[in-house]
Each structure stands twice: as C-alpha cells, then as structure tokens.
C-alpha cells in the first residue's frame, strides 16, 4: 500500500472512530460507565491506528523490534498503573 493511501485510510478511520465516540456519548442511553468503556476502547484502537498508519511503526528493517519495544512499554505501564491502583486500594481498605 502506498504512503498516500495509508495516510488517507488512517485519516478516514480516525475520523470514523472519533464520530463513533461522539455518537455514543450524545445519542445513546447507555450508562456513564458503559459510555466511558466504549470511548476508551475507541481511543486505544485509534492510538494503535496512529502508530501503524502515521508513525510507520512496522516499517523498516527493525520494524518488528520497534513493535516489541512498544508492546513491552505498554505492558510495563499497565503493570505500574494496575499495581499502583492495587496498593492504593489495599491501603485504603485496611484503614476503614
């Protein structure tokens, strides 16, 4: 796929994901938690799309290595966030 075609597809997909998030927020009667979950899902999909289509994550001779580096960074970040939440909840519940 050519660069212009990749950028066009990525741009259109980003707009569609943004409009879907707006639609879910304004025109559905879902609960706040459900809306937030859906919007975060769209945001993560859009972030991945940005990495693949615009940042050229998988291109080049070390594209696979770059992909593994990003996945590793995401796993470490997730461990920090979940671990911090777990420790804070444990500390809070032991003081109540």
From Swiss-Prot:
One of its GO terms (molecular function) is proton transmembrane transporter activity. It comes from the Bacteria. It is found in: Cell membrane. GO terms for cellular component: cytochrome o ubiquinol oxidase complex; plasma membrane. It is a multi-pass membrane protein. Its main location: membrane. It catalyses: 2 a quinol + O2 = 2 a quinone + 2 H2O. InterPro entries: Cyt_c_oxidase_su4_prok, Cytochrome_c_oxidase_bac_sub4, QoxD. Keywords: Cell membrane, Membrane, Oxidoreductase, Transmembrane, Transmembrane helix. Its EC number is 1.10.3.-. The chain crosses the membrane at residues 8-28, 36-56, 68-88. GO terms for biological process: aerobic electron transport chain; ATP synthesis coupled electron transport; electron transport coupled proton transport. Catalyzes quinol oxidation with the concomitant reduction of oxygen to water. This is Probable quinol oxidase subunit 4. It comes from Staphylococcus aureus (strain NCTC 8325 / PS 47). The lineage of its organism: Bacteria, Bacillati, Bacillota, Bacilli, Bacillales. The gene is qoxD.
């Amino acid at each position: 796929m050519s660069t212009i075609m990749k950028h066009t597809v990525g741009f259109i997909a980003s707009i569609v994901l943004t409009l879907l998030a707006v639609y879910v927020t304004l025109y559905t009667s879902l609960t706040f938690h459900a809306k937030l979950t859906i919007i975060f899902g769209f945001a993560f999909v859009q972030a991945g799309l940005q990495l693949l289509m615009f940042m050229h994550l998988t291109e080049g001779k070390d594209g696979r290595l770059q992909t593994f580096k990003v996945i590793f960074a995401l796993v470490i970040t997730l461990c920090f966030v979940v671990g911090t939440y777990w420790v804070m909840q444990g500390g809070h519940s032991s003081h109540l």
